[in-house]
């Protein structure tokens, strides 16, 4: 009886119509220009992530991006001796997505934040956190572009 139940479940789950979305099929656009405004390192990392994901030169949909980042660093945590133990980084990104064919402009605001520990490896911790936050921002921008074009 257990075998029959498992067999029936497998049959229904395999034929439910669920299909994974293949992002590579959705990438029918090319970024012709990325204009950056503020933080050079973060802007460069976002540009590299997007260019790596969107390298379809033969796509008919050409888009231009204008990216403006604001980075705020603040104290997140102190210990009993009032010494700083953690910092918080907020990255607020405003993106204009401009479609070349129609000159349609879409606005996108993204806010991400994270904390890193203060100490001997502070520079490495900060850089690693910034890289992680930039990947999140790039993924959100990419998803927004895919949803808008489809």
Positions of predicted regions on the chain:
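Bacterial Sec signal peptide processing site at the extreme N-terminus
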Residues: 10-33
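Short extracytoplasmic
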Residues: 38-53
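Sec-dependent signal peptide recognition
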Residues: 1-9
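Short amphipathic
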Residues: 30-37, 110-113
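Surface-exposed short loop/turn segments
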Residues: 51-53, 57-58, 62, 67-109, ...
């Amino acid at each position: 009886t257990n075998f029959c139940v498992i067999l029936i479940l497998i049959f229904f789950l395999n034929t439910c119509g669920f299909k994974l979305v293949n992002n590579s099929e959705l990438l029918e656009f090319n970024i012709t220009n990325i204009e950056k405004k503020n933080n050079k390192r973060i802007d460069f990392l976002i540009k590299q992530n997007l260019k790596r994901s969107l390298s379809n030169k033969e796509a008919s949909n050409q888009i231009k991006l204008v990216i403006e980042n604001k980075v705020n660093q603040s104290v997140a945590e102190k210990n009993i001796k009032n010494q700083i133990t953690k910092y918080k980084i907020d990255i607020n990104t405003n993106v204009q997505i401009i479609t070349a064919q129609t000159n349609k402009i879409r606005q996108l605001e993204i806010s991400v934040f994270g904390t890193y520990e203060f100490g001997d490896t502070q520079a490495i911790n900060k850089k690693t956190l910034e890289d992680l936050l930039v990947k999140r921002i790039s993924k959100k921008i990419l998803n927004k572009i895919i949803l808008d074009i489809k």
